[in-house]
Amino acid sequence: MDDSEFNALAEQALARIDAALEACDADLDFELAPGGVLEIEFADRSKIIVNRHSIAKEIWVAARAGGFHFRWDGASWRDTRDNAELMEKLSTLASQQAGEAIVLR
C-alpha cells in the first residue's frame, strides 16, 4: 500500500469513528483534529486517543487498557495482536473506560 492509499483509508476510518461517536448517546466529548488525531474524553476525564501512524501504515489507539495497533488487511482495520476489528475493539475499550455499554457502528 502506498502513502496516498494509506492516508485515504485512515481518513475514512477516522471519519467513520467520528460519525459513530456523534450517533452514540454516551457522556463523552471528542474532537477530530487536523492531521488525523481523534481524542475521546470521558466523564472521568480519561481519554482514548486514535491516530494514524504513516510510517508504520497503521492506526494506533491509546486507551486506559493499553496501546493497540491496527493494520489494513484489504477489507478492514485489524488489531495486530488479536485480529479484532477496529470499531469492535473501540466499542469494547470505550465501554470499559466509560463504565457503560458503548457501541460504535
UniProtKB/Swiss-Prot annotation:
SMART domains: Frataxin_Cyay (SM01219). Keywords: Iron, Metal-binding. It comes from the Bacteria. Involved in iron-sulfur (Fe-S) cluster assembly. May act as a regulator of Fe-S biogenesis. PROSITE patterns: FRATAXIN_2. Belongs to the frataxin family. This is Iron-sulfur cluster assembly protein CyaY. PANTHER family: FRATAXIN (PTHR16821), FRATAXIN, MITOCHONDRIAL (PTHR16821:SF2). The keyword Cytoplasm does not apply. One of its GO terms (cellular component) is cytoplasm. The lineage of its organism: Bacteria, Pseudomonadati, Pseudomonadota, Betaproteobacteria, Rhodocyclales. It comes from Dechloromonas aromatica (strain RCB). NCBIfam families: FeS_CyaY (TIGR03421). One of its GO terms (biological process) is iron-sulfur cluster assembly. The gene is cyaY. GO terms for molecular function: ferric iron binding. InterPro entries: CyaY, Frataxin/CyaY, Frataxin/CyaY_sf.
